[in-house]
Amino acid sequence: MSSGASVSALQRLVEQLKLEAGVERIKVSQAAAELQQYCIQNACKDALLLGVPAGSNPFREPRSCALL
């Protein structure tokens, strides 16, 4: 029973390695350039860079009623 589980685990490992071997690889310099370009293009939509408008911030402290 243990050898059956071992064979099954090895078969899964072989399948995983086949999948990983089929992944297209690119150079780190190319990946870094693409990532940098992506960040520059999407900086205008990044809430961490621009901040969240006070009116639409779901994490702000709730205000108390001014009438009370």
UniProtKB/Swiss-Prot annotation:
Cell location: Cell membrane
Topology of the protein relative to the lipid bilayer: Lipid-anchor
Stated name of the protein: Guanine nucleotide-binding protein G(I)/G(S)/G(O) subunit gamma-10
Native species: Mus musculus (Mouse)
Subunit structure: G proteins are composed of 3 units, alpha, beta and gamma.
Function: Guanine nucleotide-binding proteins (G proteins) are involved as a modulator or transducer in various transmembrane signaling systems. The beta and gamma chains are required for the GTPase activity, for replacement of GDP by GTP, and for G protein-effector interaction. Interacts with beta-1 and beta-2, but not with beta-3.
Modified-residue entries (Cysteine methyl ester), positions: 65
Disulphide bonds in the chain: none
UniProt keyword Cell membrane, yes or no: yes
Keyword terms: Acetylation, Cell membrane, Lipoprotein, Membrane, Methylation, Prenylation, Transducer
GO cellular component terms, semicolon-separated: heterotrimeric G-protein complex
Domain of life: Eukaryota
Propeptide feature: residues: 66-68
Lipidation (S-geranylgeranyl cysteine): 65
Similarity field: Belongs to the G protein gamma family.
MF GO annotations: G-protein beta-subunit binding
Gene: Gng10
GO BP field: G protein-coupled receptor signaling pathway
Residues recorded with modification N-acetylserine: 2
